[in-house]
Amino acid sequence: MKFFIDTANVDEIKKAWEVGVIDGVTTNPSLLAKEGKEPVSLLKEICQIVDGPVSAEAVSLKYEDMLKESIELSKIHSNIVIKIPMTEDGLKTVRKLSQEGIKTNVTLVFSPTQALLAAKAGATYVSPFVGRLDDISHFGMELVRDIQIIFENYGFDTEVIVASIRNPLHVLEAARIGADIATIPYSVIKQLIKHPLTDIGIERFLKDWEKLKK
């Protein structure tokens, strides 16, 4: 299972990369805007840190504009993956980019059939948003299960990125299902590392060691 970090914050990316647990990065317009930096420069900086896929989202909604923007984004670095919204024009763009050898990540996927269409169009990745489905009383992980089954049935190479992860349980459930990738906020990565019994154990070992030194 691969872990991506869901952030555009350079410090968070550096810390997670140095720990050795992440394989890529996902960003979106909101995350980039939050950093208050020029987006292209920021994406270049991220690509210099992480030796893996870095998703950058096209904000245009019309096919011609989306395609043009996507091609420009792809020129930033060879690791850039173009994030495309799950719309009709988005699918057309994915199809064209796929034909040009440009990797894509279809985002805002909320149904198995949307994921199926994205895979048919040639998407490299699809991103089902589990947390947002949970927010409206739908079990988001059921969506991931359904997508996995469909992709296995038909031998699609498209990888599933479990997105909108809110807590460590989402990561555990994604791993149990066998999802290809989980994209995780830095705050949740820190939660995954820590456990109260680990802290208690370390404290006890240190106390016992200090007694020995006396």
UniProtKB/Swiss-Prot annotation:
GO terms for biological process: carbohydrate metabolic process; pentose-phosphate shunt. It is found in: Cytoplasm. The keyword Cytoplasm applies. It holds the Pfam family TAL_FSA. It is an enzyme of class 2 (transferase). It catalyses: D-sedoheptulose 7-phosphate + D-glyceraldehyde 3-phosphate = D-erythrose 4-phosphate + beta-D-fructose 6-phosphate. One of its GO terms (molecular function) is transaldolase activity. It comes from the Bacteria. Its EC number is 2.2.1.2. The keyword Transferase applies. GO terms for cellular component: cytoplasm. Belongs to the transaldolase family. Type 3B subfamily. Transaldolase is important for the balance of metabolites in the pentose-phosphate pathway. This is Probable transaldolase. The gene is tal.
